């Protein structure tokens, strides 16, 4: 076993978006879909819990900063323009806590970061950054910009057209393989060209695949069962290639993780219709669309995927909940969602007040309550939905309680690890 001492250490990080612990470890008589990685870590991967909401923008931000949303300020893929009902899309500029690759620069360490979500637009870092999802323009997703031409020549894509997963699945699968192949080629070049201390390679196709084809994973009769397993096989080979290179270096440690787990969808659950049916939400007019049409009678609304906001006076233009009534409305919302059943089954595992999960300087932007669903119930704001539940083209959903964490020194992993612990683990592996 390689000792951790004062000598300069290097670290390889493999990120697999949405890969559940059981996909790596195997479960219920089913073998691992990532046998090479499982073997590398001698089967010692830990099950990890992640942020709430259990979505990439929040969870990867928590990973890279080692903080929760009350400190880093990213609460979802969408947020509201303060003092309005207009939706905005937070990005890397909204991150209020320092990511590890900035902090490591203060220790003279350089990082190569490839395809890490929530890092767009790319900004100067001590090393190389190729932003991950959501990145709108490749030109703004690369630092230093001298690498832009290399990425363009390689045909590099930050993300595929996930919409093909609905009804053009053959193209969708081909795009997943192509994007991973090109990303690996670019990573190979940067591995050799750059003098780095931390090298991070993230695969996001695993998340895209499971959203649309999770039902193909265990069903051997499914049309795309073999295709599902083939993509995971390619991911496994890609990761193990890097990991074997690291193992040949006595100064290098390895860490792998996912930002959330995954599971099957029994039903989608639409929060704003539930609020409307129970008298908490109403619109200005019958034909009003979206949140900008909320009425002054509404006392609450929801944003994706599981965030509830009390419609407070002074905070929102038509808010009508006075400070004196705030806690009562929160209690009423907690009672409502704690009791929600879909098809006779309990849909919500737990309702949290924001302060139970978050603290810090960004709390003014936090939702008032957050929901954690039971496995199988995929929560959505559902602003345009009429019913409280339904199904769609998605067959797989994120889970908060079955991500994974593994490293070359498993004894350093805390009992019951969370994604907020990973940055500290990285620093221990780097002997900082």
Regions from the PLM with identified roles:
Residues 2-7, 21-23, 43, 55, ...:
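Secreted, luminal/periplasmic, and some membrane-associated catalytic domains
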Residues 8, 21-194, 422:
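Active-site-proximal alpha/beta segments of enzymes that process anionic O-linked groups
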Residues 370-424:
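Low-complexity, glycine/alanine/valine/leucine- and proline-rich hydrophobic stretches
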Residues 4-5, 174-199, 209-255, 326-341:
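A long, amphipathic alpha-helix that forms part
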Residues 7-24, 40, 63, 104, ...:
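Beta-strand elements within well-structured catalytic alpha/beta cores of enzymes
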Residues 27-31, 128-130, 215-219, 268-277, ...:
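Short secondary-structure boundary/capping segments
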Residues 120, 205-209, 264:
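Feature marks short, surface-exposed loop/turn motifs that line or immediately flank catalytic pockets
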């Amino acid at each position: 076993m390689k000792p951790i001492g004062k000598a300069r250490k290097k670290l390889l990080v493999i990120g697999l978006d949405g890969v559940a612990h059981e996909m790596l470890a195997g479960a219920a008589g089913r073998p691992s879909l990532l046998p090479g990685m499982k073997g590398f870590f001698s089967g010692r991967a830990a099950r990890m819990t992640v942020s709430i909401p259990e979505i990439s923008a929040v969870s990867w931000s928590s990973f890279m900063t080692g903080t929760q949303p009350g400190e880093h300020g990213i609460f979802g893929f969408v947020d509201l323009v303060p003092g309005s009902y207009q939706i905005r899309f937070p990005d890397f500029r909204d991150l209020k806590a320092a990511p590890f690759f900035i902090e490591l620069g203060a220790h003279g360490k350089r990082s190569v970061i490839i395809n890490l979500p929530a890092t767009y637009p790319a900004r100067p870092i001590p090393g190389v950054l190729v932003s991950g999802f959501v990145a709108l323009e490749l030109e703004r997703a690369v630092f230093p910009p001298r690498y832009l031409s290399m990425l363009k020549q390689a045909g590099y894509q930050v993300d595929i057209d996930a919409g093909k997963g609905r009804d053009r699945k053959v193209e969708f699968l081909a795009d997943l393989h192509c994007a991973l192949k090109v990303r690996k080629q670019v990573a190979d070049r940067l591995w050799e060209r750059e003098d780095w201390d931390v090298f991070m390679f993230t695969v996001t196709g695993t998340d895209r695949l499971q959203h649309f084809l999770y039902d193909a994973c265990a069903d051997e009769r499914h049309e795309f069962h073999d295709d599902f397993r083939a993509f995971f096989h390619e991911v496994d080979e890609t990761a193990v290639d890097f990991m074997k290179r690291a193992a040949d270096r006595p100064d290098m440690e390895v860490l792998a993780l996912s930002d959330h787990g995954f599971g099957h969808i029994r039903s989608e659950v639409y929060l704003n219709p539930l609020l409307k049916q129970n008298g908490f939400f109403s619109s200005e007019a019958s034909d009003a669309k979206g949140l900008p049409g909320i009425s002054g009678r509404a006392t609450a609304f929801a944003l994706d995927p599981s965030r509830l906001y009390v419609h407070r006076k002074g905070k929102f233009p038509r808010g009508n909940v006075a400070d004196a009534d705030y806690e009562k409305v929160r209690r009423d919302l907690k009672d409502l969602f704690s009791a929600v059943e879909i098809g006779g089954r309990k849909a919500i595992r737990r309702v949290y007040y924001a302060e139970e999960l978050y603290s810090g300087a960004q709390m003014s932007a936090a939702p008032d309550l957050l929901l954690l669903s039971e496995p199988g119930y995929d929560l959505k704001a559902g602003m345009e939905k009429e019913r409280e539940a339904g199904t769609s083209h998605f067959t797989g959903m994120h889970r908060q309680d079955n991500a994974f964490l593994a490293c070359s020194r498993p004894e350093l992993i805390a009992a019951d690890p969370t994604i907020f612990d990973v940055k500290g683990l990285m620093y221990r592996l780097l002997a900082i």
